[in-house]
């Protein structure tokens, strides 16, 4: 018979194991509840990383109801249209639209797969040619197709204040105003006589530039505008494009004008929210030959021409070996202002193309019921700022060159009484980008070597600058201008967006003199020359206290009403007039002889100078 104490060891060894199993089960249940609560109640933006991409992008844990909420709350944007406006002497009348529909995507599925493969290939950043030829798509969107990507863009919790022209959408109104402003050279006194009708100040929705994920999505739209598709010649000529301008007629004299994906012009990629209440236009930037910070494309020649027009002091006249892009250069550091302004306003230039691009979009989406925002990178960012100021649209630019000089040359309308700090234009840049900072100039600069005269540094409205030189120890390099670098290595590397401050006082091309055809005198007073001092005056008023100037004589005669006063005044006038030179302007004196240190020792007239020289 077993003793009672003999069973105690068996009981004591089993009881702790049972407790351990119960503890593990309780912990597992608690962790499950915590995980469910985290998924259920944590905001969607934290789970989604800032933009919705479907189940493949980390949102498979969300239920179908939450996914539907994200797609219908108006913050999810998809590519719906691509607009093309031709430029150049032959193509500037071309206006086309490509609708990115489900049927179109299915018909071009093979090309889309090839495009996805291109942007996932690795690039050796030590080889500049490989970097230049690379497809510049952000690593944050690796594996996502630019044509089907969905982006999250949030509105700011506080609306922006705007004051816009009432007739801005009336056909030909803005064109006639800009033409008149050009004819009067932006004279405020004359422009104010027009008495333009402005809307009262009111609030409009604006993008939340303080939200990092919204800034990333806007930068992605700017990057999306660089997409090259389709790329083969056969595809370029397919009739998927809709002509939104004059009817397209084949031109036998210009066979390079094809109906389809045009090689020459300006593109705008239009993203639309799921509720169709907000539209974002991404304007394509520079495709630069030899400019590493941009992307390779067919529009290189026109991009370069418009860059040099918008961001140089005078038609890209940097040195005597440069070929200017217009005929406005006169002589050293002297330029024809009227000529410059007319060149910028030409129909085949990018500013007019951007206006037409916006007008074509506004035909599809009524601006009175739809919020239209514009964005772009580099040249596209500057154009977004210009069209935003023209029509009063919120604009977000990335790494754009200084566009203040172009704004003044175009004489864009300025809303009266609206403080500058309320302007809805934001320029995002970094201190290691030489183009944004305005230092990509000089003989040894990369821009100069590639043939770009990027001489402007002043921006309008707000500047939001990432100080990567101080914070990360970066050096100024043209590679830091790439939109791929901006998204992956700068915006996503910071937890917050930089503060947006107003542009401090700034002036471009301060050492240039700009002339006008109707100038009666020099724009600036001539500097004194010690080798050519002024000749002494022929009237010595100090020795003749009774003499009066002609103006004084007229004023005295007007005050004198008595006959005696009139006769006495007339008796003095002849003596005064006899002391004045007969024709002082016809035969001015000049220096005839100088001392060895430059002082004039003898004055005389031109005839006397000829006599002295002949002797």
Swiss-Prot record:
Residues 44-615 are lumenal. PROSITE patterns: LIPASE_SER (PS00120). SUPFAM superfamilies: alpha/beta-Hydrolases. Its EC number is 3.1.1.3. Residues 525-536 have a biased composition (Pro residues). Gene3D superfamilies: alpha/beta hydrolase. Its main location: membrane. The chain crosses the membrane at residues 23-43. It catalyses: a triacylglycerol + H2O = a diacylglycerol + a fatty acid + H(+). It is a single-pass type II membrane protein. GO terms for cellular component: multivesicular body membrane; vacuolar lumen. It is found in: Endosome, Multivesicular body membrane; Prevacuolar compartment membrane. Keywords: Autophagy, Endosome, Glycoprotein, Hydrolase, Lipid degradation, Lipid metabolism, Membrane, Signal-anchor, Transmembrane, Transmembrane helix. The keyword Transmembrane helix applies. The active site is at 378 (charge relay system). GO terms for biological process: multivesicular body membrane disassembly; neutral lipid catabolic process; phosphatidylserine catabolic process; piecemeal microautophagy of the nucleus. Binds to both phosphatidylinositol (PI) and phosphatidylinositol 3,5-bisphosphate (PIP2). Belongs to the AB hydrolase superfamily. Lipase family. Lipase which is essential for lysis of subvacuolar cytoplasm to vacuole targeted bodies and intravacuolar autophagic bodies. Involved in the lysis of intravacuolar multivesicular body (MVB) vesicles. The intravacuolar membrane disintegration by ATG15 is critical to life span extension. This is Putative lipase ATG15. The lineage of its organism: Eukaryota, Fungi, Dikarya, Ascomycota, Saccharomycotina.
